[in-house]
Amino acid sequence: MKKKFSIVIISVLLLGYLAPFDTLLVGADETTVSEDTAVKTAEADSATEGIESETGSDDETAEEPKEAKEAEASKETTEKEEKAKTEEPASNIKTEINTDKSQLKQTSLKAAVPAGSTYNSLFPDDNLAKKLAVIITGNAAATGNESVDSAALLAISQLDLSGETGNDPTDISNIEGLQYLENLTSLNLSENNISDLAPLKDLVNLVSLNLSSNRTLVNLSGVEDLVNLQELNVSANKALEDISQVASLPVLKEISAQGCNIKTLELKNPAGAVLPELETFYLQENDLTNLTSLAKLPKLKNLYIKGNASLKSLETLNGATKLQLIDASNCTDLETLGDISGLSELEMIQLSGCSKLKEITSLKNLPNLVNITADSCAIEDLGTLNNLPKLQTLVLSDNENLTNITAITDLPQLKTLTLDGCGITSIGTLDNLPKLEKLDLKENQITSISEITDLPRLSYLDVSVNNLTTIGDLKKLPLLEWLNVSSNRLSDVSTLTNFPSLNYINISNNVIRTVGKMTELPSLKEFYAQNNSISDISMIHDMPNLRKVDASNNLITNIGTFDNLPKLQSLDVHSNRITSTSVIHDLPSLETFNAQTNLITNIGTMDNLPDLTYVNLSFNRIPSLAPIGDLPNLETLIVSDNNSYLRSLGTMDGVPKLRILDLQNNYLNYTGTEGNLSSLSDLTNLTELNLRNNVYIDDISGLSTLSRLIYLNLDSNKIEDISALSNLTNLQELTLENNKIENISALSDLENLNKLVVSKNKIIDISPVANMVNRGAIVTASNQTYTLPTVLSYQSSFTIDNPVIWYDGTLLAPSSIGNSGNYKDGKITWTNMTATSSSTLFNFNRLKDGLTFSGTVTQPYKSAAKVTADAEQTYTIGDTISEEQFLKDVNAKSSDGAPVTSDFATVVDLNTFGEYEVTLTSEKDGIQGDSCKVIVKVLHGAPVISADQTISYDKHATITEKQFLEDIHASTDLDTAITTNFSTAVNLNKGGDYTVALNSENEDGVKAETVYVTVTVNKDPAPIISAKTEITYDKFSKKTEAAFLDDIDADTNDGSIVTSNFATAVNLDKAGDYTVTLNSINSDGVAGTPTAIIVHVEKEKIATISTNTAQQYEKYAKINETQFLKDVHASINASPTTAVLESDFETVVKLDVPGTYTVTITATNEDGGVSAPKEVSVIVRKIPAPEITADKEITYPKFDEVSEAEFLNDIHATISDKNVAITSNFSTDVNLNKAGDYTVTLNATNEDGVKATPVEVIVHVQQGERPVITADATISYDKFANITEAKFLEDIHATSSDGQSSTVITSNFQTATNFKTAMSYTVTLNAVNEDGISAEPVAVTVTINKEPAAALKADAEVSYAKNEAVTESDFFKDVHLEGTEAPSTAKATSNFDSVVDRSKTGDYTVTINATNEDGAVSTPIEVIVHIEAESAPVITANAEVKYNKHEQTDERRFLYDSEAKIDEANVEIKTDFAEKVDINKVGTYTVTLTATNEDGQAANPVEVSVIVSDAAAEKVNVKYVDENGSEISAAETLTGNLDETFSIDAKSIAGYKCDATLSGVFSTVEQTVVFHYKAIKPGVVTIKYEDTNGKAVDEDKQITGEVGDDFEAEAQTVSGYSCRAIASGKITEEPQTITFTYSTATPSKKSGEITVQYVDESGKKLADSKKVTGNIDDSYSVEAKAIEGYSVVGDDSAKGVFTEKSQTVTFKYKKNTQVSKDDPKVKGKTNQPSSTDTKLKVDNNSLPATGDTENMILAVLIGFNMLIVASIFLFRKPKTNQ
């Protein structure tokens, strides 16, 4: 450990300018320990971390985001700071006694110890006296009355007198007497109650003094004479305001005064320099306002002023020229830094949490500044940041007002730039940041990152949570490893290509539709794209290092091929629109695959997935699992909720290790083809199986072999027989709810079943679960429904036997009986059951011993048949009615369908008026039905009315109804009275026609048919109208028609009412002239002549607008312009007016974006008058907290099963925002198996993070003999025995009488007994059953035996390095001391500190003692301590280091690059690098590394070769790929010099085309350029045969093949025609036509032959030769074919004529040179025809002849043979379509 720490310290010293200061964290609330311990530890850790990240690690390190690394570093730092709070700092003192008494003389004391002194007499403070007595005598039981002399006191050099809390009875308050300890060098008085330090003034040998946490210490008088003091700790002294006494201490190096009450720092020394050696000053958590005194400290390097809330500026520090570190964090009133230009040595400044700091413009011209941390401030202005050549870390996080970062340029050493959580909208240029490695810009308002370019070392980029709509090209970021652009507004990230180091991409939570091809990402390991609008991820292929893909919650329909993803482990594409996963195969590392919630219908074979363990395909449309291939390691398969689509399983024989299978909510066995689920029978490793809600499953016999099943859910199916489950002996939980099960005897022997749910079945005998209940299992069998066979009701009553059986075999009495039934002696009786056919029911319900059994039994019944008919029937005298007609008339029927009969014929006389009672009966199978009675009434006939049809009267005549009847001669044939509606129907005061109805009825109430008479009342003459001819009104005046008529004096001659169309003809809201027509109709409806009146309406005046000046809306409010105008009470002061209010509300205001908008309201009337506009400020607020409503309480039966969703439904929980889900603690806080009241809290949080007010709901769980406790009366235990309450209850045999597992016996055992103190204790036992009934308490006596003496054991010897810091506790650990560990109270002591001199080599004997609290003393043991001599330090380094010429470096960088290390802390490595190495000159230099420790021992020198060379440019790889990214030609390489440009054209590749030129610049990073080719679809070659007139002489033929293939066609023999020719070429992308022209047959000509050869420059054959034949003297033309990798030398074609002598044409080729910068193109012709319709015509006799001439006979023979050969060759062509 020591060696490791030494290496870390040396690394910090050497790599100071490289270590990331942002990880140097200082504890926020430390009060009692020196802060440098924590900071130095953090520095060491940071340096170590820096070394690891610079030198690299394994492949996995790259994929861990740097944030995670920093978080881990921060965690480690925090842990070490916490440790520092609990441990003493390095300066704390250990008691050390010098035993060489020969060196101590009484005369050396300034004040002699009085003779006969005791500790109590010499030291007035009893606690001090006792502590010193214990320390000096070595006797832990010392009382202070022991004698003391000067020698004993002078022997002490280090003394630890730290207290407990500063307020403990054992703490020291008076240090009088310490002046006698004149040889003290280290003294710790922390955590006491000291106020007077005067006794310390003579302790001039003190080097280290700790006075922290003395709450009554108000000043430091007494320390001013401690001239050798180097370390002083006065922290956490809340009353300490003045520390001026330290000013004169000449060698003081470190002061810790944090957490005091210092407001003014006065440091003056009239006698000399103020604190001339002080290097570190801790002043955190005080109230300083001025730092002037600190500026005068000549060697001050480290200043900690964190938490000085009143400090407003740092300018008073400007004179502290040696200051290297300032921690001014949490100085909440700090508004400005002021002028600190004089701090030329400053390396680090910490300003975190300075909430009023708005600018850091002073941070410039500081040549040594390495780290600036100013997060969580109020910074708006960065200034220029000029001349900061060593700045490596700049942290400006959470400065919300920081919008401009243009100052962040020209920082050549900057490595880390953290700007998250600011208000940045534009990045700026980021010029000259060549070493920037980390850039954090998350949570800003950035809209573009196009400026992020040319950052050659950038490896980490986070721009998440911004307003980006594009990511641009991200050029020149060759080392980018980590990229996060999530939570923006991106729609296209197609530029994410060619990042060779990128291993992490996060584009989630955007609106991305296009991802692009994502090529050249060889290092990519993680890709996150969830929550976008992506439809295509086919680009995910050929990524050899890809491990994780999350593209969930998108719109994906195309997932591509997933080729070449050998390391892919996790693939999540859930919640998309994928229809097929057939490409999920050949992924050798895939472990998890989630494709739930898609539209998948095809899952493919899913083979060659050897590591796949988890698959989720739920919520899809999969019809069958049959296609699933061999998945040898699959453990979990979830294919739930495919609903009606999933109907078949297939064989399922390819998943032998499957443990969990979820198939709920499907349609398995819909077609009956799944039979008995036998396809699952081979899955013998299954432990969990869910087949819930597959409503067509009725046979489960195939599950009988699944003997390892632990959990099985078969809810909601059609299962009746469960006998197959009797073999599943490992089942622990079984759910069979909602099936058709009646018999559960098959479950009786399942001994491991502890939870059974069989609710909603047809079970009425629960006795098979007796064994389960008796062993404590939970059985739920509620809501059973069972229907008994139908019984008959005789005289409306019936009785049945109770069929319901409880688990113990007894009858379970009904809990309620319907229709007032009665239960007695196991029988149920119903009476008064009057319905003819119905059912009744009874319920049963019992909850006991963990069994819930309830349900409803239905008893159908039917009674004897009943006759029904209408109650009465009426006939008229004389009617002829048969019995059959009568029964039909009264709707007679019998309930059982039997014929109905009556006594109608014998009882009723239809010729005699009166009422008759008829009886109706029925009979069936000899059983008489219930009869009924019908009353038959025989009545007289109806009268007939006669009268005149019309009559007329004069207007206003007086006519009575009697007169009217006489006038119309009204009468009836039966002389019955006639009535009319004359008086109500006729108005004799108004002319017109009226209809009067005449009615009459006989004495039986039989009514006559109504007769109607028309009465005419004569009318008056038409009225005459008079009025003014015109009138004028103001616009918008309010005039009624009546007022208008009054204004024009309208009247008539007979007083008839004048009416007009004024209301419709005149628009008083619109200026103009209107014509109004007056009319009048008299009371008889006679109309007068209409009269026209002109109405003039004048124009309106311009109005003004009034409105509210501000309006607020909730986010997403649905507000249109009309609603807005209403909400702001916008109105026009003139009313009415035609001016219409308008606004730009709908174009200006974005209701989905909170903010403030200005809306302009205008108005213009119809006459062109424009009102003055008004502006309204519209504020769109964040979404308000949702409101939850629910019932205040709810009650559930004990042991009920209720999910959280069901609970929320039961309490009618609703929320005002339908998009927000309600959550609760129901499932965690409510125990439905235990009666009582539970408080459940409902919560909800909306999308803006606003939380609803929690709503509390009381859940009552309903609740039987008081338990009795029995137990042993006494028991004893050894002291420190580890006895739990459960063990105690077991040991005393505590039991309760009811035996219920829910009745738990409790006790106060833990609180009533103390195993650390031997004595007897009384423990009380209590018990409360599950219903809250308490048992009588029982008392038990517990005796704790005394503790024996500890047996000490340790190593016989131990070795330490010279000067190694070792405390007594360290010594105990190192010798592995045993015997005093917990729980023993024995405390080990030793003379280690007094005996062992760690500064001196030698062997020392140390004695270890121990005594426990019960006074038992251990046998002492001795240990030999060896102090070893130091050795020379050892340097290690790399043998050589390479630099580019002119590269910026120095000695520190050299030490870092050579990995130079030394095995001793505080020893510096020195080099002659600066003298030996000329970085501007190429060569090899030898640098020597040396080091010497403080003892003068020199390390062996180490030589390192430094090689300076010219910078070399990396190669450029050239790839040629098709549309799928597959290589179609061998890759090539370009080389060149650094910064030179290169350009390369796409080469010709047969079958493909690409017209592109790619260019770039050679750099220090290897590059790859890719040509993307498109496949050429071959055209057809058509062969035509025509005569000289173009007429076809034979059928066309076609030749097909691939583009670039050679083809050859020969003229075939056509009877009567002659043509001898061969055509050849290459198949091209375009169609071609070859026409052979035939002439009329003539005598055969001789033929000639040409051989075409293809050779390289050495004559080596490159391709098969080709034969060309033709008629002698015919011309020929041949071309060189294209040969890949070669170019033609010379002419690429040859021409001539056929001769009798065979001829040879040879084409020579040379091999193409490698593509280079100077010659990127491949020469050579492709020989592909340029025309799309190539016609080759061979014209006999027309071509010039060349060559030799032979005799005619030989030519004929040769020609005939060639014709045969050619014919055979032609018809053997494999690709010629005949």
Swiss-Prot record:
Induction: Expressed in late exponential phase. Its main location: secreted. Disruption phenotype: No visible effect on colonization of host tissue culture cells; no change in organ colonization in mice. The modification Pentaglycyl murein peptidoglycan amidated threonine is found at residue 1746. Residues 1-28 form the signal peptide. Residues 1725-1742 have a biased composition (Polar residues). LRR repeats lie at residues 155-179, 183-204, 205-227, 228-250, 251-272, 277-298, 299-321, 322-344, 345-367, 368-389, 390-412, 413-434, 435-456, 457-478, 479-500, 501-522, 523-544, 545-566, 567-588, 589-610, 611-632, 633-653, 657-678, 685-707, 708-729, 730-751, 752-773. Keywords: Cell wall, Leucine-rich repeat, Peptidoglycan-anchor, Repeat, Secreted, Signal. InterPro entries: Cu-Rt/internalin_Ig-like, Ig-like_fold, Ig_E-set, Inl_IR, InlI_Ig-like, Leu-rich_rpt, Leu-rich_rpt_4, Leu-rich_rpt_typical-subtyp. Residues 1510-1569, 1575-1634, 1644-1705 form the MucBP domain. A role in virulence could not be demonstrated. This is Internalin I.
